């Protein structure tokens, strides 16, 4: 039997147990989870690409089929209402026969408006979980997305099953293939558009299948944190390349970033090497029992040391941190949970009731503050950038006297650096899925 199929049985058992626990606690008969609906573009007859409800794809890898429903109570075999219309305009999904199908009682739905007859008749004690509240109300649901239920699932989503970990390994494998192709295209003089196409070709996934919009940036564009344009024309001179791009496997995401210097020599290349070394060391700092926020604080110490070593800031590292200069050059968080969503839910939670884990003082904008525990998956993605707007703000402060502005100007044509790996925390070890696949 396929490895995923074996692991999936334990995954479903875990989801059933979680469902049973929260339904008993909240006095619910069960949950009705909606995959979602296609969204029509304004004043048009075309639709936006469909994105499935993450609570739905936690149960099964059906990512591209709207109007599906799961009815589950944690004790009985889950019921899957699978949308399969008669349609000569579009490709109709095949009847489910994959490894996961045997774990569901499957009923086929021909038309979305016929679903009511397949749902529980009395919905008073069933909770609707999904985006389309007006649909839920029309169907007779009075309990919709109850906060205690969502908090419970979001908290426990951080603890990955073995099936989920295997899916994340596969997502990394696909993404690494794309990264290697993108890297080669950059060193062959390709444009951002060329690099993006090479990435998609190597992953065998379309742009809409990517878990997020790829960031493919050359030169100064590397300073734009979420740069999602693709210049079709190659620059006259290639200086640097930053790629932040992932892949999808069964609904689970990879999220990987690399930065390259075109000449592979000189001070920016050395800066990339220094950031890479810091990133690897920070990754080894993921220890069960520690706060992820503390690792973010340590990242600022590492960035400060690099700013000092390269004479970008003419101060010792300790004083750079004390003066909060690092936030100009490293303005985002160290990373986040990874799973069904790129920025997976539950990163701020202190318990399953929804209490929040406070961020470290002076670092309010993090995506993860949680206690690190085994079977959790994190990204580690330190950065160092030369962003005009932030540098302009810095120039208006007393700290401007400590900045080597000539050095800053020399680095501006390169934009910035970000390095990112995806790491599993085990009880007594770490598994860097990204570097295990030989992506330097």
Curated annotation (Swiss-Prot):
Co-factor binding details: Binds 2 manganese ions per subunit.
MF GO annotations: aminopeptidase activity; metal ion binding; metalloexopeptidase activity; phosphoric triester hydrolase activity; proline dipeptidase activity
PROSITE patterns found in the cross-reference section: PROLINE_PEPTIDASE
Pfam families the record matches: PepQ_N, Peptidase_M24
Cofactor: Mn(2+)
Database matches in SUPFAM superfamilies: Creatinase/aminopeptidase
Family, per entry: Belongs to the peptidase M24B family. Bacterial-type prolidase subfamily.
Protein name listed in UniProt: Xaa-Pro dipeptidase
Organism: Pseudoalteromonas translucida (strain TAC 125)
């Amino acid at each position: 039997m396929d490895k995923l199929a074996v692991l999936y049985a334990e995954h479903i058992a875990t989801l059933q147990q979680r469902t049973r626990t929260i339904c008993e606690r909240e006095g619910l008969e069960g949950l009705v989870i909606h995959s979602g609906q296609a969204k029509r573009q304004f004043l048009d007859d075309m639709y936006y690409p469909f994105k499935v409800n993450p609570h739905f794809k936690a149960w099964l890898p059906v990512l591209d089929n709207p109007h599906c429903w799961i009815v589950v109570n944690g004790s009985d075999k889950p019921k899957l209402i699978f949308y399969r219309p008669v349609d000569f305009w579009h490709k109709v999904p095949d009847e489910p026969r994959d490894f996961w199908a045997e774990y569901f009682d499957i009923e086929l739905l021909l038309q979305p408006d016929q679903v009511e007859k397949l749902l529980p008749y009395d919905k008073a004690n069933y909770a609707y979980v999904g985006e389309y509240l007006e649909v839920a109300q029309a169907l007779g649901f009075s309990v919709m997305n109850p906060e205690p239920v969502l908090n419970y699932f979001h908290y426990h989503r951080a603890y990955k099953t073995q099936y989920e970990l295997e899916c994340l390994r596969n997502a990394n494998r696909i993404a690494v293939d794309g990264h290697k192709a993108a890297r080669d295209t950059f060193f062959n003089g390709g444009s951002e558009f060329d690099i993006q196409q090479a990435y998609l070709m190597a992953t065998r996934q379309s742009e809409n299948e990517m878990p997020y919009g790829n960031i493919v940036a050359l030169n100064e564009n590397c300073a734009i944190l979420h740069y999602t344009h693709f210049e079709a024309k190659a620059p006259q001179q290639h200086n640097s390349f930053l790629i932040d791009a992932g892949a999808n496997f069964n609904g689970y995401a990879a999220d990987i970033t690399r930065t390259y210097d075109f000449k592979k020599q000189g001070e920016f290349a050395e800066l990339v090497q220094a950031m890479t070394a810091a990133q690897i060391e920070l990754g080894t700092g993921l220890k069960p029992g520690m706060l992820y926020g503390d690792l973010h604080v340590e990242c600022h110490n590492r960035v400060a040391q690099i700013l000092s070593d390269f004479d970008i800031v003419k101060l010792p590292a300790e004083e750079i941190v004390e003066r909060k200069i690092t936030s100009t050059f490293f303005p985002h968080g160290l990373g986040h949970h990874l799973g069904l969503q790129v920025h997976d839910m539950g990163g701020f939670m202190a318990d399953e009731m929804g209490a929040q884990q406070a961020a470290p003082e002076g670092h309010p904008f993090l995506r993860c503050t949680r206690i690190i525990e085994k079977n959790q998956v994190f990204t580690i993605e330190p950065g160092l950038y030369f962003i005009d707007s932030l540098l302009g703000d810095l120039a208006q402060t007393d700290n401007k006297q400590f900045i080597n502005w000539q050095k800053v100007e020399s680095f501006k044509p390169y934009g910035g650096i970000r390095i990112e790996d995806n790491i599993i925390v085990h009880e007594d070890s770490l598994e860097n899925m990204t570097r295990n696949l030989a992506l330097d």
